Amino acid sequence: MPKREDISKILVIGSGPVVIGQAAEFDYSASQACRSLREEGYEVVLLNSNPATIQTDHEIADRVYIEPITVEAVETIIRKEEIDAIEPHMGGQTALNLVVSLKKMGIIDKYGIKIIGTPVESIEISEDRQKFHDFLISIGERDPERYRISRSNYKEEIEKIPFMPVIVRTSFSLGGSGGNIVKTKEELKAYAEELFRGIDEDYIEVNRSLAGLKELEYEMIRDSIGNCITVCNMENLDPMGVHTGESIVVTPSQTLSDIQYHMLRDAAIKIVSGLGIVGACNIQFALDGNDYYVVEVNPRTSRSSALASKATGYPIARIAAKIAVGYNLTEIRNPITKNTFAAFEPSLDYVTVKIPRWPFDKFSVDRTIGVQMKSIGEVMGIGRTFEEALMKAIASLDIDLSYRLRLYVSDEEIWNLVRTPNDRRIFAIFEALFRDFPVDRIMEESMYDRYFIEKMQNIVDYLKTLEFGHIPENLISLKKLGISDEIIGRTCGIDPDEITRYRITNRILPVFKEIDTCSGEFEVIAPYLYSTYEDEDELPGISGFVAIIGSGPNRIAQGLEFDYGAVKAITALRKMGVGSVMINSNPETVSTDFDVSDALFFEPITVEHVSNILAKANLRGLIVQFSGQTGQNIARRIENVLGSSVVMGTSSESIDRIEDRSLFSKRLEAMGIDQPKFEVATNAEEAINKSLALGLPVILRASHVIGGRAMDIIYDYDFLVERSREVFENVNSVLVSKYLENAVEIDVDFVSNGEDFQICGILVHIEEAGVHSGDATMIFGPKIVPQAAEEKIKSIVGKLVREFNLIGISNLQAAIKDDEVYVIELNARSSRSIPFISKATGYNWVELAVSAIMTGKLEKVSVSSKGYFVKVSVFPFSKFNDMDVSLGPEMKSTGEAMYPGFTMEEAIRKSILRDIKSVFISVRDDDKPRIIEAASIMKQNGLKIYATMGTSRYLRERGIECETVYRIKDERKPRIYDMILAGYIDLVINTPEMNAGSVRDGFKIRRLCVRKGIPLVTNINLANAYSKCLSYTNIDYREISSYH
């Protein structure tokens, strides 16, 4: 069929800020879709509030709106842009839910909008669990036994359920939100009561639990005339009961019989055909022998779609977009080969393994995993065998266990970890095998298939042959199993880099194989490569190319913002006529799309794997500035292994001098640059004594970390003792620095060539200094930094550029207090704020940095902005019930949103995504004088103010009327907790107290705000900023270039 001619302008809705369950994979999907639609001559308008995405560049879409993803914004865009059609399938649950709302509110019909791809009616059937159940019955398929529990009569209805345990599910949810496995009726009643308090739906669904059955996924794609293929099937190592986003997943399935494979494939085709899917679709099955249940359908591109695309090389989102505008699978060429069509099912002659990356290194929370997602990102390993793919995925995780594999805990604890789904279960199984625990019991306790445990046994058996102090003679056999040099070195008691150096010297190197969707039957256009230890090498001629290291799995403090930099760097090299190589292990990202770079190496970002590529490919050099902390930490080691300088831009020597906080602070002192008073401590006792000498509060800062890991503002002696002991469990020295109270923190991004520099922009934190820059609410715009302070900043930047020979892009964090500028930190790399600054200024700063790296020259540019831009962070608090909401020096956010406006008030008001008519205020004594301004403004603007006794008395004494409410411990009514539950409160301002009773009360209130989705402010500066814009009504939604 020819493409549709009845539409010309298409609105693509993005997924918004990165949250758990909805991350970088949707930047990948939407970017592919936009490019695909533009190839066909359609004008593409893109809506997404996330500035860190590639899709919000004008190279991807014709018109870009970085605005709130709301009904109001979409209707404005439809009207302004005269939109013909909406593509909602590339923006995750956010976009799907929004288009369903647009349909129900009559906006789709009002403007005559066409929904391309899978119809809204099919989406509603897939997402509404009752409708989906009825649909399955109608086509002769089945889901688990189910009961619907209503809000009005849940206790009686629960009593009638004839089976336990059950799994609780909600409709239109993301990442398993609201889901839980419940074992008793009393437990279910308590959970239902809690759940109904936090959701708007009048019912929840209860299914018979299928925990323990094998879970399979089929990634399908179908066109409008009924052609349908299986892109791939995926097998979860973890059984049912663990969300597929939390499970280790292998592609293709390893343990299915041919009968089972085709039985599920036939069912998948029947389901997508019955639903009328037009585009991509993911179906999840629970397998019980030769019987099965249908668990769930995602009628859109998803996390699994991105994984399937990278596992097979089949560009699902790109193909789905073309299907959405009328093409059939038989008419669309596969862009990876150009010689085959999209109707050909991919064929794999290799194995991929995906492992999630959890944030438990940042959060001290419950590490068990289940039906709700907790992971932030994921990695994928590719190998010729399951063992090789698994071990490469483990190496890609970049956690301590990646490098040693062993878990040094008691036998009892090992069995607990094997038995209970958690982030360390795969390592506990390895440890059980090292201890010769029975395979049958390991299989029974973990419910892993015997096949996978026996493959892991192969790895353990080889490692057991290693001798301490000797490089193993069977090194090639170990490498064929994917066992990393890190694990071999640590097992043998030899520096892992010495193992890598030995291999390279003795030419024990891998070959590189191409992924082509067709098991090598056709030639590929763009090389997509993985390493393995075989004979035949398919490495293309890439001599003289420049390699960019990616940032690996998304994690707290290192996410989508760094992938943006990597992709823009590759694009810049291409513009300069320089061949580019991408090295990354993250299947969710745009950077690992097959045609972004001239050659893609899907490999772990480790000293070993990067050195292997450099040793074989004769590359011109390596750029590490766009890989977050990962590339910075391994740059010097790679050069030591290879015995040559390969890092381009700022040297690895300068990186080390900057990353070592003690050396850096001493150098600042010698240069006469102001910084907070500091001392260097080499043990816990020193840290305590030097902190007391400086005077509390202080901050303990470790070196070579990202996201302020393990940092806290320390106000009291007991906490000082506790943190000092904890921090020295992992490091040998820390910088003890005086905390600057009531200072304003700033982020300064700049590009330099070792002599000259160009400031990209200065972001001002609204909160006081002490909140991590990745979490802080920031603002950028005209004249927000005093002229005198700006001149001092420029002077400091110039000195740092020349002292450390900074070449490329860098980031300076500083604080302004009493008109003085104090340096906090320097990063000789791209920062989280570079995408934001690039979108706010309309200038490609990464391209300028790459030019400086490649030529040594720095073009002077002049940029200005007519608008103000607010950067607001998004947090994972709803996924971790035992996590406090208060912020500090250690980063907690998963993503960010940008809100632009022609005034500061408009920009800030857009960030508050609801009407505010009432506010609850409870602040500690130190903050009471500073809340007066905000409370007074809010009262003048007609807001109803509620406050706890102490705050209420303080406000009334100063002429601000408010209603007193009581804390939980006061045992009086009205209680603030009940009022929040009942919906009387629209905004909460609560600054944490330090005494135990108040801490417990405040924690419960803050957690309730998270559950109910109520805006929560824990900082007085932010409260003041909000108060000035709550009554602002002159809001408009504009194309991003109108602000430049």
Swiss-Prot record:
Protein name, as recorded: Carbamoyl phosphate synthase large chain
Enzyme class: ligase
Organism per entry: Thermoplasma volcanium (strain ATCC 51530 / DSM 4299 / JCM 9571 / NBRC 15438 / GSS1)
E.C. numbers: 6.3.4.16, 6.3.5.5
Catalytic reactions on record: hydrogencarbonate + L-glutamine + 2 ATP + H2O = carbamoyl phosphate + L-glutamate + 2 ADP + phosphate + 2 H(+)
Pathway where it operates: Amino-acid biosynthesis; L-arginine biosynthesis; carbamoyl phosphate from bicarbonate: step 1/1; Pyrimidine metabolism; UMP biosynthesis via de novo pathway; (S)-dihydroorotate from bicarbonate: step 1/3
Annotated segments matching region Oligomerization domain: 399-539
Subunit structure: Composed of two chains; the small (or glutamine) chain promotes the hydrolysis of glutamine to ammonia, which is used by the large (or ammonia) chain to synthesize carbamoyl phosphate. Tetramer of heterodimers (alpha,beta)4.
Protein family according to the UniProt entry: Belongs to the CarB family.
Region called Allosteric domain, residue ranges: 916-1044
Residue sites binding Mn(2+) 1 per the record: 284, 296
Start and end residues of each stretch annotated as Carbamoyl phosphate synthetic domain: 540-916
Gene: carB
